[in-house]
Design a protein with these regions (language model features):
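Short, surface-exposed alpha-helical segments at coil->helix boundaries
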Residues: 44, 70-81
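Active-site phosphate/pyrophosphate- and oxyanion-stabilizing loops and adjacent acidic/basic residues
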Residues: 6, 48, 81, 104, ...
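Short helix-loop-beta junction
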Residues: 50-54, 81-91
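Short, small-residue-enriched loops and turns at beta-alpha junctions
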Residues: 65-72, 124-126
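Structural beta-alpha unit
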Residues: 1, 85-116, 121-126, 133, ...
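Charged helix-capping and loop-helix junction motifs
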Residues: 2-4, 75-79, 131-135
Length: 166
């Protein structure tokens, strides 16, 4: 995203939204890719608020690899259902998309939506170095406007900030 923004996002002791402005005007369609977790739940809450205000519909998307076993696909479906519950009365649908490249699949799907809202990563520094940071790649490459949502996790967030400074 950028060094100043990265620092603010990492150091903030509150929930944070980072927006890369793309298209102008109210969105008609929101893409909400999710892999679960507190940042994804916050992203769903943001999508719900925007959709209620604008009348937009929300597509909740989960990416699985071709090798994903049936049990994990069932968990993915359950995760989508939990996200739909967060969206409450907002017009929404779900998609399970099969791809070997999660970020590229999200970027491709973003072309069909006005706005993409994604939760910040929960991955550790080593995983990000090896696999890349999916929300950042989506933020750089997705069509339209992108919002990255990061929930303050209280003591967990403060401990992570303390240990990553050292």
């Amino acid at each position: 995203v950028g060094t100043t923004v990265d620092t603010v996002v990492q150091e903030a002791e509150c929930d944070v939204l980072v927006e890369r402005i793309g298209s102008q005007g109210d969105p008609d369609s929101i893409l909400l890719p999710t892999a679960g977790g507190p940042h994804a739940e916050y992203a769903a809450e943001v999508a719900r608020a925007i959709a209620r205000t604008t009348g937009a519909s929300v597509t909740v998307q989960r990416i699985v690899t071709p090798e994903t076993e049936d049990r994990e696909r069932e968990r993915a479906r359950a995760s989508l259902d939990e996200t739909i519950d967060v969206l409450d009365d907002v017009a929404s649908d779900t998609q399970i998309v099969e791809s070997v490249d999660v970020a590229s699949a999200i970027v491709e799907a973003s072309a069909d939506h006005d706005l993409t809202i994604i939760g910040a990563t929960r991955e550790g520094v080593l995983q990000q170095l090896v696999f890349g940071n999916i929300p950042e790649q989506v933020g750089r490459e997705a069509a339209g406007t992108v919002i990255m949502a990061k929930r303050d996790l209280g003591i967990t967030s403060r401990l992570r900030r303390l240990f990553t400074r050292s």
